[in-house]
Every structure is written in C-alpha cells, then in structure tokens.
Amino acid sequence: MAKWRLATATLRRQLQSSSPTISTFKNPTKALSAAAHQSTRSYSTTQTDDSRGKWLTLPPFSPTIDGTAVGKDLLSDGDSVKSSTDNSKTTALRWILRCRPDLPRTLVQKLFRLRQVRREMSMSVDGDELQRSQLKRVAAKESLNVGDRIYLPLSVDNDTPQTPPAKKESFQCSDEERKFVCSLVLYKDPAIIVLNKPHGLAVQGGSGIKTSIDELAASCLKFDKSESPRLVHRLDRDCSGLLVLARTQTAATVLHSIFREKTTGASAYGVKKNVKSLKRKYMALVIGCPPRQRGQISAPLRKVVVDDGKSERITVNDNGELVSTQHAITEYRVIESSPHGYTWLELRPLTGRKHQLRVHCAEVLGTPIVGDYKYGWQAHKAREPFVSSENNPTKQSSSPFGLDLDGGDVSSKQPHLHLHSKQIDLPNISQLLEKMQVSSDSDISDLDSLKFDAPLPSHMQLSFNLLKSRVETCDKN
C-alpha cells in the first residue's frame, strides 16, 4: 500500500508539470485517471496520428544499391544490372538507424517498446500515382516497402546526447590555393569528379607528405555535397593526369568494384572487350626503343624489401614463385621514336598493380621512363645530356603547395617523371544510379560511356616540342 501511494504521488507530480488540467480536479484519483487516459489517447486515435506536425519524418525508404554487385554486372556481358540487396530484409529498426546514426540504438529500441514509432505506407493508384495511408504503429522487425515513411516523436532530439562527435580538422586553403585546386577539375556530375592531377602532388597523405589530393578534396571540392569526395584509385605522386573521385558513398562502392573487377577479370579470364568496361591510356617518354612497335606484356610482379627494410620496390617475378605474386598485363604501342634515343609510348594497363607501368617499361621492355630514378637509375646515369637548339629559359614562378610546375623537361639535368594518365573511359555512374533508384533491375544497354582526355603537363609538352623540333631539323639536314 505504501508503495502504491509513493507511485501515485510521483505520477501526480509528473502530470502536474506536464498537464495544466490536473489542478482542476478536486479528486486526485479521478485526475490521475483522466490524465492517464489523455496520454494514452494521444497515441491511439486516428485524428492524432494524422497530425503530421507532431512527428519527426524520416526520408522515404528506397532500395539499397549493392555497389560491389553493380560493378561486377557492369563488367559482365549482360545488358542489365541488379541490386542484389534483398529489400524485404530492411526492417523499420534498421532504416531508422541508417537515417539517424546519431540516435543511440537503445533509445530507438525503447521507442518501439513504448509503441511510439509510426509508419506511413505508400500505395499505388492505377499503377502511377502514390497515395499515402494513415499513420500506423510499426514493430521494429517489420519489413519496409519502397516509399514507406517512418515517423518518430519530436522528443527524440531532446533525448539524444547533444555532444557533437569529434570532427577531423579539414585542411585550410587560402583563396589562391582553393582557386588552383578548383582549376584542376575537368568534369563534375552528381556521382563523380575528374581531376587533372599535377606532377608532384600526392594522392593520399602519409609519412613526409604535407599536402594530398585526399585532404584538398575534403576542403575545396565538396561543392553542393555534404560528403567529401572519396578516392577510388591511385596515381603515383610524380605521375600526372586523370584522377577520378567519387562524390557519394554509393558511387565510391561502384567505382571501387569497377577498378577491382577490371584487374581481377583481366588476370583470371583474359582481356574482355566490353564497351561498358573501364579503359585507361597513359602516355610516357622512355629511354631507348622497344624491340617491337606494339605488343602485350604479361609479367607477374612481386614486392621486395631493400635497404635493410627501410624501403621497398616492385620487381618482375622471374623465379616462378607464386607467393605474394600479382599478375599484371600491359599493352603498349610506339607513338614516335627520336634519333636521340627517346621513344613516346602509349600504355594501356589492363590490370591495376602498384608501379606496374614503370616496372614493365624498365624491366620487360628495357626502356625505363624518363624521370623514373627508382627503376631506371642506371639508364639515367648513362643518358647523354640533351642539348636544346632553342632557348627555353626555365620559369621561376611560385606554385601552390610548393609544387615544381616549371622545368623538368628532357633537357633538364634531372627531368620530372614523364608518365601521364591521358585518357579514361568509364560508364556513366550518375546515369546508372538514377536508373537504379527507379528499378533494382535496370537495363544498361543504352548506358552512356564517359570519355576524358587530360592535356599533357608542361614538362612533357615541352619535351614533346623539343624532340619534335630536333626530328624536323635532322630531316632538313
């Protein structure tokens, strides 16, 4: 009896603070009963359920795209892609946690136990228009249909801890640096950004790296997105040219799968001539001339540790050991040879291994890339200085982030790396994701292919002009 009185007193105090009508009752027991009935009624009547203003509305449920599966389908021979995610397994609880990751799971589960979560189902009318149903209670494990909305009490924001999560400080750019980074953008759509990366700018941070594309993208290249662009493939620090960034997590998953499946497919099943697949072309200036005008290099690579474990390098695996060996395939074509011992090559990597093009050129073709001192040091020591007949003074301009964007051509004492990611063809990911939002089984027979071409960096363009002029001079003589 004492416990009941204590509970009654506690409930009376709570209701007095929340309900102004409690003081109008002379009989406390009747007051408690009326207030309790009023509280229960607010969650049970249709009229209150249809008052959308008192609820926190989550986005309508949409199919989850399995980016990995989509990437595999794109590189297959079929004309459709499927989202392999089984939407019937997406429960109300899972959708709430996905839309509101800031809400503690225990709080969301408590809302379900208190029957304070509502569902508004979407129903098709004549196959075209969508009609909304009344709000109804939903259980945590109930599966959602496409278009369903979940409603939560507005009080959840008050019950959520207000301590903001620790955020990683973004790289701070000056106006001049921001303008420079934005000038690298060649293409932008809702799914991807394509950059023309300059020589000397690292793609990802690490030991001894002050500035990277990864940091700069988060600071300067968000544009209208709340998410930072994500890396989906790599270029060496000294390699220039086309670099693709994903603007959303879904686009990143699809692109990761495309780059990965391209390598896996070429290694295991040979080259697939699929018009929707990824295609990449590089341009390189090498020392010497390959024995043939064109060909395909298929040489496995492995990593070796040198300098007492202080560094590592990639080398062709000649001894047939399969341990830590990665198959690598490169197609090459001679563009033009110079009488001074240099050759312009077009390189097509069919797999994406670390330092693949540099090692294949140096160790398989015997023609290291100009400026590649890691894999072509001996060739550079024996290289005869290229003396230009033209007066090409080196500009001493100030470049952002300490980049050396002047000089470095073939006439320099230490030329920059002459390897440039010049062309990329890839499926239109933005168009694909739009199709997938409409249907999880999408026809991609008419999917567009995006083609990008990056102009040569200044040091390679100058080398091209110098060698071209020397060839013309020799022809005249």
Curated annotation (Swiss-Prot):
Biased composition (Polar residues): 36-48
GO biological process, one term: pseudouridine synthesis
Top class in the EC scheme: isomerase
Any single Gene Ontology cellular-component annotation: mitochondrion
Main location: mitochondrion
Active-site residue list: 236
Organism phylogeny: Eukaryota, Viridiplantae, Streptophyta, Embryophyta, Tracheophyta
Organism: Arabidopsis thaliana (Mouse-ear cress)
Reactions performed catalytically: a uridine in RNA = a pseudouridine in RNA
EC code(s) of this entry: 5.4.99.-
Matches recorded under Gene3D superfamilies: Pseudouridine synthase
Protein name as catalogued: RNA pseudouridine synthase 4, mitochondrial
Region feature Disordered, mapped onto this chain: 34-55
Keywords: Isomerase, Mitochondrion, RNA-binding, Transit peptide
